[in-house]
A protein has these predicted regions:
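Active-site glycine-centered loops adjacent to acidic/histidine catalytic or metal-binding residues
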Residues: 13, 125, 263
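Conserved alpha/beta core of the MobA/IspD/sugar-nucleotide pyrophosphorylase nucleotidyltransferase superfamily
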Residues: 3-7, 183-293
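Phosphate- and divalent-cation-binding pockets in alpha/beta enzyme and binding domains
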Residues: 17, 71-74, 131, 201, ...
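N-terminal glycine-rich phosphate-binding loop and ensuing alpha1 helix
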Residues: 2-70
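Conserved core of the sugar-phosphate nucleotidyltransferase
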Residues: 128-220
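Residues at the starts of beta-strands that form the adenosine-phosphate
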Residues: 6, 59-61, 82, 118, ...
Length: 293
């Protein structure tokens, strides 16, 4: 990795689709298993991803917290890596989307999207092989969507369509007609890179979509122009960058396991099979990616 990176992990959401599991604990802090085959300390979605980013050379890691924030604040104090926390203070997280959370990081005093470094934006509820990050970190210095070539056919998957140099569509449940016959590139991982040359455009687009807090009270610009306004998800920013012709696609294959956890069924799979197989693969580089099947 020759470029400097910063990362923002979005951990403010409620995780309501996991039912009772997330009534008392943030989704990002749900346990997934041991840190490694040799360190049996229980880790979580959030801790594993933060430690992976730091081990890969990303030295500035910002985590956006919201729901049950104090638990995350207390948990990160026990970690061996430096992270910075930014709060999304919206009282009702049901009306605050992931792009709104990202805006709080961007407007914080921590230099996010200030043109100095490549900026990684990542969901908190994902688990992947450590080499997945290397695929993105070693890619050209241009704004890029990280995509897993493998797809399951599940309509819950967010898939990208187009070409690697010009992805055009991003979304769930898209049919060939809705993407103009563009080929499927794979499942979007929830990890996006914004290059320094695109930071001003990204900041302006975020303010345009979810609302500019510096605009006049009651104005359209203050409320935002995206249909969902504050509830806009960060994938809409990526889709907008596709329209600008500023987004590229970086892909990895099924040899590197990746999984997003949306609901209780998927969480059970992470715990029972996916993550144990992933750890075994990381401990034995020659092992095939059975966890990804």
């Amino acid at each position: 990795m020759t470029q400097q990176y910063q990362a923002v992990i979005l951990a403010a959401g409620r995780g309501s689709r996991l039912g009772d599991r997330t009534k008392e604990i943030p989704k990002a802090l749900l346990p997934i298993g041991p840190r490694s085959l040799t360190d049996r300390t229980e880790t979580t979605f959030l801790r594993r991803q933060s430690e992976q980013l730091y081990a890969a050379g990303v030295k500035q890691i910002v985590i956006v917290v919201g729901t049950l924030k104090q638990q995350i604040i207390d948990d990160v104090k026990r970690w061996d890596i430096p992270v910075t926390l930014v709060e999304n203070p919206t009282p009702d997280m049901g009306i605050s989307g992931s792009l709104h959370s990202f805006q709080y990081a961007v407007r914080s005093p921590h230099g996010i999207l200030d043109g100095r470094m490549q900026t990684i934006l990542a969901d908190a509820d994902i688990v992947y092989h450590r080499d997945v990050l290397k695929t993105l970190l070693d890619s050209p210095a241009q704004s890029s969507l990280l995509v897993c070539h493998r797809t399951s056919g599940d309509n819950e998957e967010v898939r990208a369509y187009g070409s690697e140099s010009r992805p055009r569509f991003l979304g769930k449940g898209l049919t060939p007609a809705l993407v103009g016959g563009e080929p499927c590139l794979g499942e979007a991982t929830g990890i996006v890179k914004f290059a320094p040359q695109d930071h001003v455009l990204a900041r302006d687009t975020i303010n345009w979509m979810v609302g500019d807090p510096d605009a006049e009270e009651g104005s359209l610009r203050r409320r935002g122009y995206s249909p969902a306004r504050m509830a806009t998800e960060h994938e809409e920013l990526t889709q907008r960058f596709m329209r600008y012709g500023r987004m590229h696609c970086v892909r990895f294959g099924q040899e590197l396991p990746f999984m997003e956890c949306d609901d209780a069924r998927e969480y059970a799979r992470v715990r029972e099979s996916f993550y144990p197989s992933l750890l075994a693969m990381e401990g034995n580089p020659g092992k095939q990616a059975s966890a990804a099947s």
